[in-house]
A protein has these predicted regions:
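A conditional alpha-helix N-cap/helix-loop micro-motif detector
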Residues: 31, 109-114, 208-212
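Extended, charged alpha/beta regions that create polyanion-binding interfaces
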Residues: 55-164
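Glycine-rich phosphate/diphosphate-binding loop of Rossmann-like nucleotide-binding domains
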Residues: 155-210, 214
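Short, low-complexity N-terminal leaders and the immediately following helix N-cap/first helix
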Residues: 1-84
Length: 219
């Protein structure tokens, strides 16, 4: 990729480095310049633009991010659309996010132009939570770098969301003579809230005196 001033006559296909006002039209940073954009710039009296010109074999930031995200995609993870060189990946279900840190470190060591960030290992996630993001720093990268990342990702599951399995739960509470029923009621409420993210529920609850014989009978 070559970056710098580019005459309009050679700017078609280049990636605009800065947002540029062309008459009544504002052309956004990162736009791949086509015939319409070139015409608008020329009509506005602009002779050259700051832009990135891709070399043969280069991939623009969005295509590179899409390919890497596709290589990383695994069970329980959904890939969102690419924009400004970034693709976010989100949990498709509630569960536990697991990541192979060694593989992530290897990917991030390929080149500073390519970064992948994730949540920590063994984090509980809900559906829709962002678990990872792929970011291409420059406007384009060499396709060989993306090939290298794909090769690392092919070594094994880089990350994924292991969905919870819903369970029916029995809750047995013991109480001392001075224990208030409201305290036990609060415990039930708290337990239900903890079980809800996994789709689990309290099937039945039993309360018994706080002694070994009573607890044994309850069990």
């Amino acid at each position: 990729m070559k970056f710098g001033p580019v005459p309009l006559a050679r700017a078609e296909g280049a990636i605009l480095a800065h947002a540029t006002q062309a008459g009544a039209r504002r052309i956004k940073k990162g736009t791949r310049l086509g015939e319409d954009e070139i015409a608008a710039l020329r009509e506005a009296g602009i002779a050259e633009v700051a832009a990135a010109v891709l070399d043969p074999g280069d991939l623009d930031e969005n295509e590179a991010a899409r390919r890497i995200a596709a290589a990383l995609k695994s069970r329980g993870v959904e890939v969102r659309d690419a924009a400004t060189g970034r693709v976010n990946l989100h949990a498709g279900k509630a569960g536990v996010f697991c990541v192979d840190r060694a593989l992530i470190d290897a990917i991030n060591a390929v080149d500073p132009a390519i970064t992948v960030a994730t949540l920590n290992d063994h984090v509980r996630v809900e559906p829709g939570r962002m678990v990872a993001t792929v970011k291409i720093i420059p406007f384009a990268v060499a396709g060989t770098l993306v090939d290298a990342v794909e090769a690392i990702a092919a070594r094994g599951a880089v990350f994924g969301v292991h969905p919870f399995t819903a369970r029916r739960v029995a809750l047995i509470q013991t109480s001392l003579p001075g224990t208030k029923p409201s305290v036990l009621d609060k415990t039930v409420k708290t337990m239900r809230a903890r079980l809800e993210p996994s789709g689990s529920a309290i099937a039945f609850e039993r309360r018994t005196p706080h002694d070994e014989a009573s607890l044994a009978r309850a069990l």
